[in-house]
């Protein structure tokens, strides 16, 4: 990988906040260094628990995972630590730990999630997905980065804050560790409504994002929204012999392939009419992604052209993107000479900031139904909608975070958009309109979150803990949220 400085990432002003001027930054670094091996070992213990919030996986593992997280938080001296929801209620187990503010100090909410994505084929991993391994300066394993690293970053930052400032720092801290984020947070709105007072805060940190490059401290300032859908195409009502009926009758996979092909134009840009596409906008307009570096980061094969129009950052952050993430048809190994009557696909549509997700879902449905190949039956089921997100970087808590990131990495921090989605940010914005919501994280282009061989860059992780601990200390010294 090239030096991150070659990516032309402009520095962000990192003026020391007045309420942080007296902090001994080196004391925080030293405290993190003392704790770091222990933190990584504890992270490895969390990685070993295969807590997956999908229906086909064992829910008992999620309970184990929540109990392990609760035990870590109890050890840090929180006044209350509870696993929610209670038995018999809907939703997979989350953990809420709270210590109230004292002396008029603000309260912060630290979010992460303990559930993980399925590992895929374990044999495809270099090492077992649920056995954390250190290798080449990284920690490998499912959830090592997304998002059990976020869980342990919160635990470690709270630990370091207490070690350096003492237990009477006065900052109100609530840690909320969700248990079904990778399943789309289906119960988040209801959970938030039931626990609104418990989760109330002046500033919120969502530790579930990434850095621009290894070695570049980053605050994510915008996210695309999301629409998830399943489309099924059917041409006949039963299986047919491919020799006896092939020709006049097209099989389900062919019909579906033709329908999917209408979703992009000849340049590879999304062709769903009416979707907002900010081709000329790069978010904050500052970061530029070198195409050679992008191809290396993404593993694009030689000779394969990149899709879409406009700058790479606009294609990643401010334009829609549509991917086929699942496809059901007869498997190659069990196929016979028959015409399959139907096929279906799962679609993931990322929508630009400013696009209403309900409208985007309607536009996607209308496109699919109006482009039915050869008049085939097309059924569309919308399974998920989530709005885009943008944060106010002029807020004091945001300025504190940009400063803390710069100090932790000893280099200027940057702001970036992200093509992914965290749908519940809109719920948090609605519930707590005065709170600054800050999206941080420790993934990088080599992390492969959700993929085979997920990993965490350990030195950046060390710095991320320093940054969060410094931010907490700055918040403790502030009279404002």
Located regions from the model:
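N-terminal helical capping/dimerization or prosegment-like subdomains
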Residues: 2-122, 342, 346, 359
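Active-site metal-coordination/substrate-binding segment of hydrolases
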Residues: 105-177, 463
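Short beta-strand/turn micro-motifs at beta-sheet edges
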Residues: 217-221, 332-337
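Zn-dependent metallopeptidase/amidohydrolase metal-coordination segment
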Residues: 232-234, 256, 339-343, 396, ...
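Acidic-enriched catalytic cores of C-N bond-cleaving enzymes acting on peptides and small amides
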Residues: 242-327, 355-377
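Short, solvent-exposed beta-strand/turn "edge" segments of beta-rich domains on protein surfaces
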Residues: 248-249, 334-341
């Amino acid at each position: 990988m090239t030096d991150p400085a070659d990516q032309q990432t402009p520095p962000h002003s990192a003026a020391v906040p007045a309420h942080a001027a007296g902090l001994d930054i080196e004391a925080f670094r030293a405290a993190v260094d003392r704790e770091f091996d222990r933190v990584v070992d504890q992270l490895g213990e969390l990685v070993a628990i295969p807590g997956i919030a999908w229906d086909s996986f064992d829910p008992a593992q999620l309970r184990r995972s929540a109990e392990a997280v609760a035990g870590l938080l109890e050890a840090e001296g929180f006044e209350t630590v509870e696993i929610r929801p209670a038995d018999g209620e809907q939703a997979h187990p989350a953990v809420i730990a709270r210590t109230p503010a004292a002396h008029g100090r603000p309260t912060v909410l630290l979010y992460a999630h303990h559930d993980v994505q399925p590992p895929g084929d374990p044999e495809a991993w270099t090492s077992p997905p649920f056995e954390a391994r250190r290798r080449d300066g990284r920690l490998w394993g499912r959830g090592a980065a997304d998002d059990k690293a976020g869980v342990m970053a919160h635990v470690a930052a709270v630990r370091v804050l207490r070690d350096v400032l003492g237990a009477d720092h006065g900052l109100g801290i609530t840690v909320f560790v969700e248990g079904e984020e990778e399943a789309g947070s289906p119960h988040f709105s209801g959970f938030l409504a039931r626990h609104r007072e418990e989760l109330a805060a002046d500033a919120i940190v969502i530790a579930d994002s990434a850095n621009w490059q290894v070695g570049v401290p980053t605050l994510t300032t915008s996210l695309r929204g999301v629409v998830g859908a399943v489309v099924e195409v059917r041409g006949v009502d039963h299986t047919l012999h491919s020799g006896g009926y092939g020709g006049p009758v097209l099989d389900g996979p062919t019909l579906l392939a033709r329908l999917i092909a209408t979703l992009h134009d000849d340049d590879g840009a999304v062709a769903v009419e009416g979707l907002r596409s900010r081709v000329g906008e790069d978010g904050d307009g500052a970061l530029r992604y070198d195409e050679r570096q992008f191809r290396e980061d993404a593993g694009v094969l030689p000779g394969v052209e990149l899709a879409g129009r406009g700058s790479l950052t606009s294609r990643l952050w401010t334009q829609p993107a549509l991917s086929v993430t699942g496809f059901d048809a007869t498997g190659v190994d069990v196929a016979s000479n028959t015409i399959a009557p139907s096929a279906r696909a799962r679609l993931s549509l990322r929508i630009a900031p400013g696009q209403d997700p309900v409208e985007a879902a309607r536009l996607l449905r209308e496109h699919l139904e109006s482009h039915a190949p050869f008049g085939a039956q097309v059924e569309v089921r919308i399974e998920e909608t989530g709005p885009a997100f943008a944060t106010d970087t002029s807020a004091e808590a945001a300025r504190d975070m940009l400063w803390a990131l710069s100090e932790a990495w000893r280099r200027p921090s940057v702001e970036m958009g992200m093509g992914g989605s965290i749908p519940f940010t809109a719920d948090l914005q609605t519930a707590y309109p005065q709170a600054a919501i800050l999206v941080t994280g420790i993934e990088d282009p080599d992390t492969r979150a959700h993929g085979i061989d997920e990993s965490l860059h350990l030195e950046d992780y060390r710095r991320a803990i320093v940054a969060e601990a410094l931010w907490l200390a700055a918040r403790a010294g502030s009279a404002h949220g």
